[in-house]
Amino acid sequence: MNIHFLYGTETGTSEMLCEDIRDDLDLQCEITSMGDFDASTLDGDTFYIFVTSTYGTGDLPMTAQPFYDAIASNKPDLSHVNFAVFGLGDMVFADTFAFGSKILMELLVDRGAKMVGERGIHDASSADMPEDIAVPWAAGILDIHRAAAA
């Protein structure tokens, strides 16, 4: 199974979290900023795990916005794409908590992509480190995806 992490970040936390998941689960995978990834190349042979923070008033980080905009404007059929989403947010901003991952997830599903499992979320105001939530979440998501692919 090909695994590709695509992240959106302002401060580097999402990228580091992808690396933590890869290392802790001993995955052979790619890790790429959404800002450096051509949305038209999403393929059905790869399982995509999106990790993104929320910026400003519930927006995607600047590194993820071009990816989002390309899908929103081109409206591709993504029915061949399987993905999961993990969002980083802060409940101090309860009205827009983890909205970056939410709006990305909604767009992908709207274009026909198949989401595996539930969206994972980390609250920066909690005592938990992001990797303490994301690593077990990712392990569960990968188990679900492997079982469905078998």
Task: Label each residue range with its predicted role.
Residues H4, G12-M16, D24, Q28, ...:
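FMN-binding flavodoxin-like domain, especially the glycine-rich phosphate-binding loop
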Residues D26-S40:
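A short, well-structured beta->alpha microelement
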